Amino acid sequence: LPYHRVLDGIEEEAKSDTDLDAGTTGRGIGPTYEDKAGRRGVRVGDLLDPAVLRERLEYAVPQKRALAEEVYGLDTGEEFDVDALFEEYRAFGERIAEEGMAVNCGEFLADRVDGDAGVLFEGAQGTSLDIDHGVYPYVTSSNPTAGGAATGTGVGPAVVGDGEVVGVVKAYLSRVGTGPLPTELDGDLAEF
């Protein structure tokens, strides 16, 4: 949601001169995962029922607005307006319903696996950025390892490992944001 991006920027700015500065893409992923873990996130299924959507927004948005205004001292706009968010995301929910785009992901994938259909999971980033196994605190908010495919899709871990798992490894580490970069060269070697 729009307030996730705003909060991401606010928090990164607040941490910019500290050891807590992890550097982000600014897309609001961290605050979104905070809401998921806090069980206050708005999920795709919530968009399909206007009453549920409004209830979720009325619960979460005032907390986010208070954080931005009272903790960080900022003025907030439509990104923190329950009515504006409700209208925008209710329309998204209507479109999702009309076009049949929402499915139970675990069930959808299990049907394909049981039907011998090939299933391909694609991830990004890597172990060094994994929230549990990466170079903390310079990590993303998710699990971008092969095990994360099971966590994020609803299929069992045996499904991911039962077929073939192909890992792609770069010859060097790269990253978005700040944090250690073990393969980084300094001095004259860095100028090649």
Task: State where each predicted segment sits.
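Non-transmembrane, aqueous-exposed alpha-helical and coiled segments at domain scale
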Residues: L1-F192
